[in-house]
Amino acid sequence: CVDNIANKTFSEQDLPFIKDIEKVALNRSKHAKILAHIGVENTPEAAYKLLLKLKYLDQTFNPYPARHGIPNDVDIETEMDEVELVDLTHLNSYAIDNADSNDADDAFSVDGDKIWIHIADVSMIVAPGSELDLYAQERASNLYLPDQILHMLPTSITKLCALGLSETSPALSIGFVLSGKEMQDIEIVHSTIKVTNISYDDADKILDSNEDLAKIQTLVELHRQYRSNNGSMSLSLPRVDVRFKEGQVEISDQASSPSRELVAEMMIMAGRVIALFAQDNDIVMPYAI
């Protein structure tokens, strides 16, 4: 066994020792006796490299989720609560996201002087304290890795809640009128909307020519100026997208663009409106910076 593994090969009889090495590679054990015998460090990285050389693991295998105790996605049966929905399907709602995204979670629309920001309404499925709620709390957020996405919630919920996957989508809609520096005529409702999904690149091309997006862009610039006048700071840090496709690593610059800045500012506006709503209705909420 020792000779086999030292020579970067193994047989079926060696599998118990290989399993011990795998436990070290995945951070489930701190020590495998055989590693000391063949002069390999008892560390996850050294054990992982050995398993690659033995061709026990494929080079595309990502050990990091297992090392950190992050389980694979689990499917949990879900059904949507029956809630009275405000019909906003007459509005053109735009979900701007990466070209390869299929789980848009925000969209925007214009209704006269009123702006609507729509958020995927997971609350219609995930009740406080439910099995799904506890599952999501344990995961905290989606984990985006180059080779996979480990979801905070079962992927079946994405199919129900993601904006634009169906002809109409349920949403939590935040409506307001921006009058000078004031947010007025605030509404927060459960709604149903009709969504047009559009990539950042395509949105950049029509920001000026699309009547709705041009109006939103004007209000976004006014709100950004209001924040700047009140001492806000904007940090422009380099960002990249790292993806693993067809056995190749792809690294691309995530350059800033007008549509990305528009989406970011709309989320800030949504946060401000929700904070005002919570304040007016004595709702206790965390404050995030």
Segments (PLM) and residue ranges:
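Electropositive polyanion-binding surfaces
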Residues: 2-30, 34-39, 49, 67-68, ...
